[in-house]
Amino acid sequence: MGGGGGLPEPEDSVLFRRGTGQSDDSDIWDDTALIKAYDKAVASFKHALKNGDISEASDKPKSTPKRKPAKKNKSQKKNATTALKQWKVGDKCSAVWSEDGCIYPATIASIDFKRETCVVVYTGYGNREEQNVSDLLSPACEVANNVEQDTQENENESQISTDESENSSRSPGNKPNNIKSKAAPWNSFLPPPPPMSGSGLGPGKPGVKFSGPPPPPPPPHFLSCWLPPFPSGPPIIPPPPPICPDSLDDADALGSMLISWYMSGYHTGYYMGFKQNQKEGRCSHFN
């Protein structure tokens, strides 16, 4: 207790003691084994190189058979030589024009035997172009190409026409019927035409022909919706104009105006015919 010394700690309470086991300076990432394995692999590889085991494997790609470009070149030269012997100046041929890649008929203007090229003049165009002799085609190739192009164009046109017919069939059908149905109310709503013979109207005698003007033709069908229905019989009072809301546009206003003109002309003609009928009836009565 005395002497200022502390009490000794019991053994069970010690958690860490420096200097026992691993120290703070020890390297826990020791790669000695990895270095030894690497050195062993390198040594075995060097040993195999000395014995010649790997040299044979490395020499195998060198012993593979070489390609034969020379033979191919020989065959190409042979074909080119044959083409040079086949074509001559003035011959008809077919050539691919470099601008569009299409085949056109041409005539050989000159041949360079060293370069294995030639100059062709396209028939009907006059364009001159240098071509390889091996690329020249027979005139029949141009005809076959034209036939193929015509066939392709016909197929495209037929496809377009088929698409158009399908689109028309998919569109709202029976448009003429719809137009007729819209125009039908004119026939039922029109006032009856003036009588062509004596019908008891006015003092005219029976059988007196009516020489008044015929009624005007009905307006276009798109204005039929503006004509209100009224019962058949002699017109007494013109039908009232449709009630136009404030939101009508120019087309609606134009339709209302045309309807008014039509009805005004019709009733004016009817009135003039009626008066003419009365006048002729009076003249025949006095005679």
From Swiss-Prot:
Q: What does this protein do?
A: The SMN complex catalyzes the assembly of small nuclear ribonucleoproteins (snRNPs), the building blocks of the spliceosome, and thereby plays an important role in the splicing of cellular pre-mRNAs. Most spliceosomal snRNPs contain a common set of Sm proteins SNRPB, SNRPD1, SNRPD2, SNRPD3, SNRPE, SNRPF and SNRPG that assemble in a heptameric protein ring on the Sm site of the small nuclear RNA to form the core snRNP (Sm core).
Underlying gene: SMN1
Ranges of compositional bias, category Basic residues: 63-77
Q: Does the keyword RNA-binding apply?
A: yes
Where's the Glycyl lysine isopeptide (Lys-Gly) (interchain with G-Cter in SUMO2) crosslink? K46, K205
Task: Output this protein's name.
Answer: Survival motor neuron protein
- The answer to whether the entry has keyword Nucleotidyltransferase is no
User: From what organism does this protein derive?
Assistant: Canis lupus familiaris (Dog)
Ranges for domain Tudor come to: 86-146
According to the UniProt entry, the note on domains is: The Tudor domain mediates association with dimethylarginines, which are common in snRNP proteins.
